């Protein structure tokens, strides 16, 4: 006997407020029925950790005034993660000399239309794919050997900053490409790409807030 878990996506609206300059009037764009279609977390040396969150909206409208009931009171004092806050792991082993580590989730999302509809009829989702890429200095052949031998790995990224810590873990990951690059007097580098597969009972990616170290 098996069971399935279904998570219903919540929709929301995004209001873009463009301030008028030199006497120009303000403009407002409201996008309704918004659903996130994935994300990409980029971690690189000498940079802040950044995230991209593409989305699809069911409809979009240009307004001449702020929608009734809109409020803009908010307080934001969180401190974003930087490259010095990031540690990458292969299982329990810390990965050394990593320059970049990017984790991408793609749900194969597309907007579907129907005859007679002036807006999106519904948002269709395909099978989610959690992929990654990392690059760094080649100081041994451990990761290259795992690519050549098609060894499954579990990669993690832990970010620990002043406001707390969180982790991204890719379960049952497989390297799909590994490229050593040799050129000039500089260090030999290794670029790796891969995808996490998970199992029918385990997600291919786990994102959580943690206590670290």
What are these regions (language model features)?
Residues 1-213:
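Signature of extracytoplasmic/envelope-associated structural regions
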